[in-house]
């Protein structure tokens, strides 16, 4: 017998085991998930989050989460994540979880829901289409195997323009002091992220939330490379995050440049420094994710030797009015 019930904090580990089994390339630790949920609870926007667990004979076999993203927030926009263990699929469990989540968002008056699946998941995308979702964007995981990366071929691209130097965030904190360094880093990220392709407009992220997100164990100040002017302004950035489920892998966060400094090769120069640093520390793989319409970044990653994986297809039901902070 299959039962669907609201999940409790005691179910978090079981739900995470299901998620990690279904999406091993994006596996998380329990600590990471707890940090993420705590960030949602503490966010001043008070984003909604609700989890459900599907059980067969008392065994957890599926999970769903309906939540709101503070970084692209609208009070009527939700995100749905759903996972069912492969050996329990085609039994109506995914449909039951979806129906439970759907009744929940209808009860809350949702006007937009975003959900998706890998293009290789034969059943998931047709299920979304039958329920009124339409494709709005694709995201590619790109993987670089560092054993084939030759830094010597990129020496020219690693040079920065006169008056700009590369420094890690860890070193910038030593130079400027912690508070000044955080402000400089935050100012760059706040502007650079505005033009990142996404399925909804970005909303403002407060400094406190920016810092809180980077208080988790995957953040490494020595893995954040910044381009800094003589005046101390951070004008470009490239982040490398630890992967706690695979210590031989790093994940690229945001690589971006402030608008006035673009088309000078700053982002590439910083990304290359991170790749060299990773190689020196015995890292075997670097992963990044790019939207299908981010053609320049996809082309650059192709040049660097990244290899595209099957796309994640993001789908949308309804549409909320754009909410810009």
Label the predicted regions.
Residues 1-42, 51-55, 60, 157-205, ...:
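Short amphipathic alpha-helix that is part of the acyltransferase structural core
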Residues 9-12, 19-120, 229, 234-249, ...:
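Conserved donor-binding loop and adjoining core beta-sheet/short helix segment
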Residues 42-46, 215-220:
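Short loop/turn motifs at secondary-structure junctions and domain boundaries
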Residues 59, 70, 86-93, 98-176, ...:
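Acyl-donor-binding surface of acyltransferase catalytic domains
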Residues 90-103, 130, 257, 263-276, ...:
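Conserved acetyl-CoA-binding loop-helix of GNAT-fold acetyltransferases
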Residues 131-150, 223, 252, 276, ...:
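Active-site/acyl-donor-binding loops of N-acyltransferases
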Residues 193, 197, 211, 219, ...:
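Oxyanion-binding "anion nests"
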Residues 235-255, 260-273, 277-287:
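Extended hydrophobic/aromatic segments used for targeting, binding, or gating
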């Amino acid at each position: 017998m299959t039962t669907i019930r609201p999940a409790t904090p005691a179910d978090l580990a079981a739900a995470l085991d299901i998620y990690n089994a279904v999406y091993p390339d994006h596996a998380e630790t329990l600590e990471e998930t707890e940090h993420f949920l705590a960030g949602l609870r503490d966010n001043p926007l008070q984003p909604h989050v609700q989890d459900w667990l599907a059980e067969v004979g008392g065994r957890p076999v599926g999970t769903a989460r309906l939540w709101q993203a503070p970084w692209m927030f609208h009070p009527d926009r939700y995100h749905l994540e759903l996972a069912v263990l492969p050996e329990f699929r085609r039994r109506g469990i995914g449909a039951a979880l979806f129906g439970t989540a759907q009744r929940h968002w209808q009860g809350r008056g949702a006007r937009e829901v975003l959900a998706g699946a890998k293009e290789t998941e034969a059943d998931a995308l047709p299920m979304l289409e039958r329920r009124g979702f339409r494709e709005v964007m694709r995201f590619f995981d790109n993987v670089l195997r560092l054993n084939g990366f030759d830094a010597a071929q990129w020496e020219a691209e690693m040079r920065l323009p006169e008056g700009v130097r590369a420094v890690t965030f860890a070193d910038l904190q030593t130079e400027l002091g912690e508070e000044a360094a955080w402000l400089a880093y935050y100012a760059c990220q706040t502007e650079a992220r505005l033009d990142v392709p996404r399925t909804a407009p970005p909303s403002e992220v407060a400094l406190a939330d920016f810092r809180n997100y980077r208080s988790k164990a995957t953040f490494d100040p020595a893995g954040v490379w910044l381009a800094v002017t003589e005046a101390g302004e951070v004008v470009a950035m490239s982040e490398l995050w630890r992967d706690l489920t695979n210590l031989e892998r790093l994940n690229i966060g945001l690589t971006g440049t402030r608008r006035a400094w673009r088309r000078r090769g700053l982002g590439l120069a910083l990304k290359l420094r991170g790749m060299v640093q990773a190689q020196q520390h015995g890292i075997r793989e670097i992963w990044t994710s790019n939207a299908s319409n981010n053609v320049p970044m996809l082309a650059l990653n192709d040049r660097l030797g990244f290899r595209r994986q099957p796309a994640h297809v993001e789908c949308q039901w309804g549409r909320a009015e754009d909410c810009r902070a």
